[in-house]
């Protein structure tokens, strides 16, 4: 280690480790539930499992690499670049998985009768593979030349050094801010966010429309319908809020770095923004799994079978097709 870890860095590392310790078990539990319960094998839960795989990797790989970059070891330029790229790949995979889930929820509401014929297991698998392939393309783009090597080489040569530059490995030293803002943010983060807003607004509209039809054709208590509508709306608003809260701050800071290089960015703001992006992986099991009845039942069985040594009866795979708890 080139230098001792400061108290501030130690606190950062401690928080990152805590996030990883929450993220990895939570998302492993989601994957485990899909594996053991046949009722969780349809397209919706496959998308959620794909998201969980990405989030496990965030906790098990991205966070340790982020800690390594924060310490700033002396490495060759391309070695540092290889350390930085998995962060881009896996965070992008999480974003695309969230978008796939949003599209899947829209199709469930828009074409409920034809949903199973349109969203087949084969098509769902193709969509999942497509998300990962796109994530690899986006995340590995810096390896193919869109990076800061030319700037580093100029400074390296000016000092009379030869060979591949050896640098203190830091994310912003190797990753181009033009790439992060113009390509990553403006193409692969902001548009999916806006698209999800539109999708969930349409989902809300369609649900409200259907509930209105039911209310107008029913002599029952309309409060029941409005209550369910409100709960669904709150769930969708929570999804959007957590996504925006987690990803926008760091990208806004990147925009400030690019467009106002002389502007001062408090270090604590950068750390908070990083915590939010990584913390989103720990939030996802709660948002996408713990509000689904089939997952809760499976989680309870896993807990009792493997941790309390009190086997539960077999899971009833004919649970109602309820997606969000009433």
UniProtKB/Swiss-Prot annotation:
It is found in: Cell membrane. A lipid is attached at residue 309 (S-palmitoyl cysteine). GO terms for molecular function: G protein-coupled adenosine receptor activity. Disulfide bonds join 80-169. The chain crosses the membrane at residues 11-33, 47-69, 81-102, 124-146, 177-201, 236-259, 268-292. Keywords: Cell membrane, Disulfide bond, G-protein coupled receptor, Glycoprotein, Lipoprotein, Membrane, Palmitate, Receptor, Transducer, Transmembrane, Transmembrane helix. SMART domains: 7TM_GPCR_Srsx. Belongs to the G-protein coupled receptor 1 family. This is Adenosine receptor A1. It comes from Cavia porcellus. The gene is ADORA1.
